[in-house]
Amino acid sequence: MVQTLDEIKLSGLTYASDSQPGIYRKGKPGNFHYETKDGERVKDKEKLARIKALVIPPAWTEVWIANRKSAYLQVTGIDAAGRKQYRYHPDWTSRRSESKYFRLLEFGKVLPTARKRIAKDLRRDDLDERKVLAICMQVMLKTLIRVGTGAYRELYGSHGLTTLRNKHVKIEGSKLRLKFIGKKGVKQDVTFNDKTLAKLVKSCMEIPGQDLFQYYTEGNEHRPIDSGKLNNYIKEITDCDFSAKDFRTWGGTLEALRQLAICNVEAPETATAKKKVIVKVLDCVASKLGNTRAVCKSSYVYPVLLEAFENDQLNKYMKKINIKPAVSITALENDEKVLMAFLKAVKNNKITIKKAASKKALAKKSA
């Protein structure tokens, strides 16, 4: 969070959070009005003009608007699918795009601490909310599957991590298999081995009800977790405004780096050969994330990584990657350190990228 605050200060903007008092949208579509924390109706023409310019979707609920027009975070709300959405100040969005290394690098810095906090919560005695959220996060770290929302399950019959049901899980000893229909009807079939995690997931399955990830309240009632609870937990364990998507982006970029290292054994030299390698790599990442190649390239793989590969600026990093499956946490951490070294090199301008190509890739990424 410290780095984020520093970046906000450098941008000339001010910090804001929806946990702070703000302006709240009331009423129904076509007849909205706005109130302060104290319930006073907002009548100031300048404030109302700013709110109108934000173009907040009518379908959003629980809308919070920052009091100050200089706030880096301008609006939050819940969309029709039940997902929390954020609208940032244009200057902040622009700065984050220009600081190409910023979000992934900062995420990599807090990841070790987040893992330690998850491990601590996994050792809790009771299957309370915190322990089940930690179990859910551990499954995410293993699989990188989407979080999912109750709205998507009801509307489209698709599932994600937080909406999985017991019928989607099969456990045999230390082997855990997740088989379900994901977003856009894509069939997901993920298997991994982890004796401890399999035991923890099995304990969740023993809680009455169809939902896989449920917890016991202090009153011994069982309730399911949801995407909001999980993303709030992520913000807590990272001390920053990260979400489940950041874990998937980190995992997708790390997998891309690993696959580039594996494919580079063949030492492709021509531009055409390198482009073929990139297609192959993106297919591998897509398989891991349960996405299409196009979505992975635009949203889950850091574009500068692919450009560095094409420009022969990734070789020294690929040589340090374990090209055998990273079955141990030590091997995984080694590869993550290599990725961090690359991101720091980008930050320090030691990796030179063609500006036109970089901007095009980043425009796609933020779309």
Predicted regions and their residues:
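Acidic, low-complexity interaction regions
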Residues: I262, A271-A367
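A positively charged, amphipathic N-terminal helix/segment that binds anionic biomolecules
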Residues: M1-H159, T163-W250, L254-I278, L282-L289, ...
